[in-house]
Structure formats: C-alpha cells, structure tokens
Amino acid sequence: MPGYSEFYFNVDHGYLEGLVRGFKAGILTSADYVNLAQCETLEDLKLHLQTTDYGNFLANESGPLTISTIDDKLKTKLLTEFHYFRNHAFEPLTTFLNFITYSYMIDNIILLITGTLHQRPIAELVPKCHPLGSFEQMEAVSIASNPTELFNAILVDTPLAAFFQDCLSENDLDEMNVEIMRNKLYKSYLEAFYKFCEKQGGTTAEIMKPILEFEADRRAFIITINSFGTELSKEDREKLYPTCGKLYPEGLHLLANADDYEQVKCVADYYAEYKAVFEGVGNDSGEKTLEDAFFEHEIKLNVLAFNNQFHFGVFYAYIKLKEQECRNIVWIAECISQRHRTKINNYIPIF
C-alpha cells in the first residue's frame, strides 16, 4: 500500500512521470537497430527512423543528409522533450532537472576553453556544444586566461558558481589545468547532486544513489588511467576523485597509488560490480573498450530505474538512455556514410 507521500507525489509530479514513461516506451529496440544497420544510405536511415517515435524529425532537411545534421536534430528533439518536463515541473523536481543540465554545462565550458587554446574561433565552437548545457554567457568563455578570471567574469552568475570554489587559481589555462578543472567541477557537481538526492529520501534516493555512486566511481577509474604518463602526482590525482561512490574511501586510496592499468584492474576486483565491468573488456583493438563496458553498465542501472514508481530517477534515466540512443544512431550513420560496415554493429543496444 503506497504511503501518504507517494499519493502526494502524484499531485505535483504524476503527470510528468507518466509522460516520461510513455516516452521511454518509444526508445529504439534491438529489432530497430538491426533494421537501421541494414540501411545502405543515410536516406534509407531517415526512412527507417520515420517508422519509429522519431517520426518526421528530419522532414525539413531538403539537401543531402549529413552526420552533423542528424546529430543536431537528435539533440534538438531531446532538448524539446526536456524543456517540456522542466517547464511543467514543480519543486523539488525543477531543481532535480536543473542538476541534470549542469554536467552538460561543465562539458560545454571545457570544450570552449580547449577549442580557444587551439585558436579555434568561438563561432565554430558554440554549435558543437550540447544544447542541454547552453547558457547566456557561454560565448564569453574565450576571454578568460585563468580559472579565477573565468569565474569572476563569466561563471559567477551561473549555477556552476557553487561548484567552482575548488577550481579557483591563477594558473594559466593550459591543457593539463583545463582537465584538472573539469575533474574538480565534476567532483563538486556529483557530490552536490548526491546530497540533493539523499535529502529527497524515499525511492528517489534509493534509485539515484547507486546511479550517482557508479558515475563517481567511473570518473575515479578513468581519471586514474588517463593520468598514467602525465605530470599529475598521486596526491593531486586523489584530490580529483568524487567521494560519493562505492570506492570511497579505501578503493580511492588504492586507485591513487596505482601505477598501471593492471593495478587499477586489481582495485576493481575488490568490488563485484566493477570486477564484472573490467572482465568484459577485450584486449584486441576490435573488442569491447572499457568505455563501452562502462556505458553498458550505466544502461543497466538506468533501465532498472523504471521498475519503481513515485520517484525522480526516471527523468535522469530517460535522458541518459536517450543520450546513448543518440550515440548509437550517429555511430550507425557514420558507418553507413563511410561504408565501414564491419563495425556497424558496435552500438550498445538498450532493450
């Protein structure tokens, strides 16, 4: 028998939860991907997508289809759905949905700074940013020469200001410092999101905590592996790890002292969930990568979110599943476009 709070949940959030579950029913199945992978041209792909929930989302494209057009339209469709959720949400769901956008904002800022470091014009970089993470001051990012300047001139009035306290320094924004800044921002963001979900309690906390714990631990594994062969010290590396995952504290300390991939794998062996992820990784170039193995595990966690009702986790899970779906469609489209059919089935199906 549902408790009072669950009945109350439906008063403010029931309509949107029902809607997101309806949208989830339109996510492409394995059979849809088999059909897409058999397409010979991008026009064939467009016709097949018209038979799914994507419908006529490419109908207004009169010229020859390109990968970037397909990618843009997929993101625009997801953005439209997300804006509908947020525009009709009540607190605390509104804040929860805003939290989802912050990771995209971080990625956009890093993309713009990195592009500027390589003398790329800002007008060329902005279209590459994810629309879920766009904000008004975005184009001004290129004027900052160090993190403190970036914060004071641009980010102080954005939601990311709260995550920026650990990033403030006078160090020049070179590639190494930009990566450190990305990881510090993500650390603060994930820890804040975790606390917010914990505060909501109930099923939202029950569903979201394992998802965010996995995200925190995935970042710790990737930070460790990417730091091998760089100037980053073990002490500095440990400061970048989010502390809201299952690895905290012992696992993170072991990762901080790891010297190579095998030692990272040994740390994963202590955690059944991550041992299975690392065991699924192939050694040859054509086999499954660690990134793919992490994506597969993420999909499982997000699909599980739909097994419970009366919680916010379904909104996060839906956005992440659609993001993977977009990656799958773009991957298949690229293989068709480049006539690289041997790898066309290397997508990650959701259902």
Swiss-Prot record:
One GO BP: vacuolar transport
Q: Which Pfam families does the UniProt record give?
A: vATP-synt_AC39 (PF01992)
Q: Could you name the Gene Ontology cellular component terms for this entry?
A: apical plasma membrane; early endosome; plasma membrane proton-transporting V-type ATPase complex; proton-transporting V-type ATPase, V0 domain; vacuolar proton-transporting V-type ATPase complex
Disulfide topology? none
Q: Does the keyword GTP-binding apply?
A: no
What keywords were assigned to this record? Hydrogen ion transport, Ion transport, Transport
InterPro entries to which the protein is assigned, alphabetical = ATPase_csu/dsu_sf (IPR036079), ATPase_V0-cplx_csu/dsu (IPR002843), ATPase_V0-cplx_dsu (IPR016727), V-type_ATPase_csu/dsu (IPR035067), V-type_ATPase_csu/dsu_dom_3 (IPR044911)
Keyword Transport carried by entry: yes
Q: How does it assemble?
A: V-ATPase is a heteromultimeric enzyme made up of two complexes: the ATP-hydrolytic V1 complex and the proton translocation V0 complex. The V1 complex consists of three catalytic AB heterodimers that form a heterohexamer, three peripheral stalks each consisting of EG heterodimers, one central rotor including subunits D and F, and the regulatory subunits C and H. The proton translocation complex V0 consists of the proton transport subunit a, a ring of proteolipid subunits c9c'', rotary subunit d, subunits e and f, and two accessory subunits.
What is this protein identified as? Answer: V-type proton ATPase subunit d 2
